[in-house]
């Protein structure tokens, strides 16, 4: 039993990864809810970044579980720009095809901080944004060797990040992000 546990533990890999992304925060907000903001913003994207740690647990020869702890920043787009500082915990299942690893999973996020960029438009503040987010994750990873890899991930937020406003129940803010990065296993 001890030998089996030691063998299974030796196959678990730890690592770091970081990268940049395109934030496609989806937003629809009425003008009278937040002074100066458009009902729908048309700007296509904003930039974001991420970095964190991961653990990779083999479930079989080809199937792996991927658990991560990541800091990300997401910016809302359009007038009244706001940056959401997030701690994401994604969990994905990866399948190894000769170093190419498609993955699918989900994530939960805690949003401890919101940075408002004051200009002539009002930005969202901490009280306007929910503290938690969740959603689906799709990705693809290419491994150059056993240690170094590149990755791309798409986060599809399912939670409405705006706090409730009884006047505008149809207002919403959702996470939509594409990240591209580099990772290293120890």
Which sequence ranges carry the predicted segments?
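Outer-membrane beta-barrel strand-turn architecture
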Residues: 8, 57-61, 95-99, 144-146, ...
């Amino acid at each position: 039993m001890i030998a089996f546990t030691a063998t299974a533990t030796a196959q678990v890999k730890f690592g770091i990864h970081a990268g940049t992304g395109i934030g496609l925060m989806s937003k629809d907000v009425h003008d009278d809810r937040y002074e100066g903001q458009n009902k729908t913003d048309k700007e296509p994207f904003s930039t974001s970044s991420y970095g964190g740690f991961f653990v990779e647990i083999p479930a079989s020869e080809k199937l792996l579980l991927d658990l991560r702890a990541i800091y990300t920043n997401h910016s809302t787009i359009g007038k009244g720009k706001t940056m959401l500082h997030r701690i994401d915990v994604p969990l994905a299942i990866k399948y190894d095809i000769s170093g190419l690893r498609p993955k699918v999973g989900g994530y939960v996020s805690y949003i401890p901080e919101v940075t408002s960029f004051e200009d002539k438009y009002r930005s969202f503040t901490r009280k306007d944004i929910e503290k938690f987010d969740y959603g689906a994750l799709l990705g693809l990873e290419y491994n150059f060797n056993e240690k170094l890899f590149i990755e791309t991930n798409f986060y599809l937020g399912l939670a409405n990040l705006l706090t409730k406003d009884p006047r505008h129940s149809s207002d919403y803010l959702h996470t939509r992000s594409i990240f591209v990065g580099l990772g290293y296993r120890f």
